[in-house]
UniProtKB/Swiss-Prot annotation:
It is found in: Nucleus. Residues 616-633 have a biased composition (Acidic residues). InterPro entries: ARM-like, ARM-type_fold, WAPL, WAPL_C, WAPL_dom. Residues 68-79, 87-96 have a biased composition (Polar residues). The lineage of its organism: Eukaryota, Metazoa, Ecdysozoa, Nematoda, Chromadorea. GO terms for biological process: DNA repair; meiotic cell cycle; mitotic sister chromatid segregation; positive regulation of double-strand break repair via homologous recombination. Residues 35-64, 172-182 have a biased composition (Low complexity). PROSITE patterns: WAPL. This is Wings apart-like protein homolog 1. Disruption phenotype: Mutants have an egg-laying defect and reduced brood size with 20.8% displaying embryonic lethality whilst 28.38% arrest at the larval stage. Recombination intermediates accumulate in mid pachytene nuclei resulting in delayed meiotic double stranded break repair. Irregular polar body extrusion from the egg pronucleus and localization following meiotic divisions which can lead to aneuploidy in the embryo. Altered meiotic chromosomal organization due to shorter axial elements in late pachytene nuclei. Belongs to the WAPL family. GO terms for cellular component: germ cell nucleus.
Length: 748
């Protein structure tokens, strides 16, 4: 190719390239290894004269990305194998001479040609300069283009709060540097914006990748539902209380608000919300003016009744008890008679929904109220039953019941209803009220000396006189009542016995007062010698134990009562025998013998049923000798033992049935043993200071001695000591049993 190109031609100016210093010493050898370009390799390029090979050569040149038509010759010249050498960046004369020696064909196209000199040769391990894009900040100085060194610009970054934010910023900056080489990066970050109400508990910080964020602490569906219910309960309660506490609201509005609150209290979750948030005081404070209106008082009593129905009922303080005492005295509706039926119907609907909701949940509800008997007093009495039973160990509550006049009202209520029953009035509702009143007094008098003394001496012993009258009414009327009514009377009688046991415990005054009431002691003995065996089969155990315990309290420290008891003649019936009248001491002794023998029979049956074969050699011999012995369908052999082979073939239902029978017999054995023990304890106390009647007792005992009584009392002592050892109040009971055992042992 011709080399007559003008040196002033602008396209003949050299393109400055950096020399790689690491390859200068090997440049001559590498030039010899470069293959030459033949005409056959580029058919469109004409032959060019040979160019002498220089000892030094520059590395391959990187071409601009865009070339105009004017520099096509330069492109072709740079693609040859004999590329001119660049001695330095500042020397341009040698490059100009090299460019003049090369002939550029103007007819040659501007397309980029391939050369083996620029191909990657893995064997040569050539270090090539990376292809770089043309920078915008190139500087043209005298025909040479310099790329100034790019210095990192210092950018001020404000540190806002904590070190954690600094670490997050470092993470984000490192991640952005890592992905800075990616093409087509968006100008706006892909991280979603957080709402202004976002908190650290629900929204987390962005991930290191920079793509979105991760939400932590996601609540479960049930947690979301509970949270929503909690908010609803809180808003509803605040709204209702605002109406109840408003001074401008009328009594009608407050009454309707209280009924709305009662409808909310039907839900167990709402009642639990009230207790967990300690809203009881706020509710009681909002209902403090309810006694001023009878219908408002009915709605308030409904709220208190529902709040006390749970096992973990609300805590009752002094303001609550004061409200209860005020509502307890409202027994009639004397205000707003035109709205009475409407309010009563609304309250009755609340109770119907409550009963329905409890039955759906599988819980049995005992609700014996009638619509026509709905009053604030009746509802508060029902609520007091639960309040006192849950606070049986709270002495402060028991004292406040007395100070606020609640016990006085309950005693008066008992007197009124006993008189109604004695006058042959409608006694169904009266029996229900007596049942509730007995429960309240029982809980409020247990191990509380002050309340016991008050109940005994209040209004000239009106309580114990009313109880003795009620006992006489039961014995006179039980023959005329239907079976269902008899059950109600016997159940109420058992509760009355519990109350009398509490107030007569270690109280000589009560014992003497009860012994002085005409007919009380013989009637008390008749309850377990005649009434319980004949009419109260379901409550026979309770009547026997409760009434025997009451008589034990009466004769333990009062010899006058012992003499009165010995002188009495009572009716007695033993199962399988006719009714007969015998002396009281003989009746108690014969009942002891009966129950003790029943316990021994059950004990022997249990020994036979629980004696399983162990599969020893002796058993095999017995089986060979008695091989003809067959077992019945229940798996019991003729000798009374359970057949193990038969038991192994029984399915699970049959095994459960067999075990249930064993447990029933064990329960019957325990009941018989306990009743016999209490009869023996009563006989032992009656015989003290009355040794003249020892022969009357011995002639009815097995072996004519007291050994069976002593053994039963020792069992009772061990059982009581094991179950009541931690209670200080039971120490007197231990000592009483010990004294009777020692007394009977001396008699032997």
């Amino acid at each position: 190719m011709s080399s007559d190109a003008n040196s002033d031609d602008p396209f003949s100016k050299p393109i400055v390239r950096k020399r790689f210093q690491a390859t200068l010493a090997q440049q001559g050898i590498e030039d010899d290894q470069l293959p030459s370009v033949r005409s056959s390799d580029s058919p469109d390029v004409p032959d060019t004269p040979d160019v002498p090979v220089n000892q030094l050569s520059s590395p391959p040149l990187s071409l601009p990305e865009t070339l105009s038509e004017g520099n096509a010759e330069t492109l072709q010249n740079l693609s040859d194998d004999s590329e001119p050498e660049m001695l330095s960046q500042s020397s341009t004369s040698s490059l100009n001479r090299r460019m003049e020696d090369s002939a550029i064909d103007p007819s040659r196209g501007t397309r980029k040609s391939q050369s083996r000199g620029f191909d990657y040769d893995p064997a040569g391990e050539r270090t090539t300069a990376p292809v770089q894009k043309k920078k915008k900040d190139e500087i043209d100085m005298g025909g040479a283009k310099f790329f100034p060194k790019q210095e990192k610009k210092h950018v001020y970054t404000h540190k806002w709060t904590t070190e954690e934010d600094d670490e997050d910023e470092k993470t984000i900056s490192s991640s952005s540097n890592r992905y800075s080489s990616r093409p087509n990066q968006p100008a706006v970050s892909a991280r979603p914006r957080q709402p202004v109400y976002a908190t650290t508990s629900t929204y987390s910080k962005p991930l290191a990748s920079g793509y979105g964020s991760r939400v932590r602490h996601i609540k479960e569906a049930n947690e979301l539902r509970e949270s929503g219910e909690y908010d609803d309960f809180k808003q509803d309660l605040v709204y209702i209380l605002s109406s109840l506490q408003s001074s401008d609201a009328s009594m009608k509005v407050k009454c309707l608000s209280a009924i709305s609150l009662a409808k909310k209290c039907v839900s167990p979750d709402f009642r639990q919300f009230i207790k967990s948030e300690n809203m009881t005081k706020s509710i009681v404070k909002a209902l403090m003016d309810s006694p001023e209106d009878d219908l408002f008082a009915l709605a308030a009593s409904t709220v208190l009744y529902l709040l006390t129905r749970d096992f973990n009922s609300i805590k009752i303080d002094f303001p609550s008890l004061r409200l209860v005492s005020q509502l307890l005295r409202i027994e009639k509706f004397e205000q707003r008679p035109e709205d009475k039926d409407k309010v009563v119907n609304m309250v009755w609907e609340v109770f119907n929904s409550y009963i329905e909701k409890q039955e759906v949940g599988g819980q049995k509800v005992s609700f014996d109220m009638r619509k026509e008997s709905l009053t604030p007093s009746s509802l508060i009495i029902e609520a007091l039953v639960f309040i006192c039973s849950r606070s049986v160990n709270d002495d402060n509550l028991k004292s406040e019941l007395l100070n606020l006049g609640i016990l006085q009202f309950v005693v008066a209520k008992i007197e009124t209803n006993v008189n109604l029953i004695a006058d042959n009035a409608d006694d169904t509702y009266s029996i229900l009220i007596l049942n509730r009143c007995f429960r309240i007094l029982e809980s409020s008098s247990v191990f509380h000396k002050k309340n016991q003394a008050f109940l005994i001496s209040h209004r000239s012993n009106i309580l114990i006189s009313s109880l003795a009258k009620f006992l006489q009414v039961i014995l006179d009327r039980v023959h005329q009542l239907a079976e269902e009514e008899v059950k109600k009377y016997i159940s109420c009688l058992a509760l009355m016995c519990r109350l009398l046991i509490n107030i007569s415990h270690d109280n000589e005054l009560c014992c003497s007062k009860l012994g002085q009431i005409e007919g009380f002691l013989p009637n008390a003995i008749t309850t377990f010698t005649y009434l319980a065996p004949k009419f109260g089969k379901e409550n026979s155990y309770d009547i026997n134990v409760m009434m025997t315990s009451l008589l034990t309290n009466l004769v333990e420290r009062c010899n006058a009562n012992r003499k009165v008891l010995i002188a009495q003649t009572v009716k007695m019936v033993i199962p399988g025998h006719d009714v007969e009248e015998v002396p009281a001491l003989e009746a108690i002794t014969r009942l002891f013998v009966y129950h003790e023998s029943q316990a021994q029979i059950v004990d022997a049956d249990l020994d036979r049923e629980l004696a399983f074969d162990e599969g020893g050699c002796g058993d095999e011999e017995e089986e060979e000798e008695g091989g003809d012995e067959s077992s019945d369908e229940d798996g019991v052999r003729k000798d009374g033992r359970l057949d193990r082979n038969k038991m192994d073939r029984m399915d699970q239902v049959d095994v459960v049935h067999a075990l249930q029978q064993v447990m029933n017999k064990a329960s019957a054995h325990m009941e018989g043993s306990v009743i016999a023990s209490y009869h023996a304890l009563l006989v032992g106390f009656v015989l003290q200071q009355n040794e003249d009647h020892l022969d009357e007792v011995r002639k009815h005992l097995p072996g004519k001695n007291f050994q069976n009584m002593i053994s039963q009392l020792k069992r009772l002592y061990d059982f009581t000591k094991a179950t009541m050892a931690k209670r200080v109040e039971s120490n007197s009971g231990f000592r009483a049993i010990e004294r009777v055992i020692e007394y009977l042992e001396r008699l032997e």
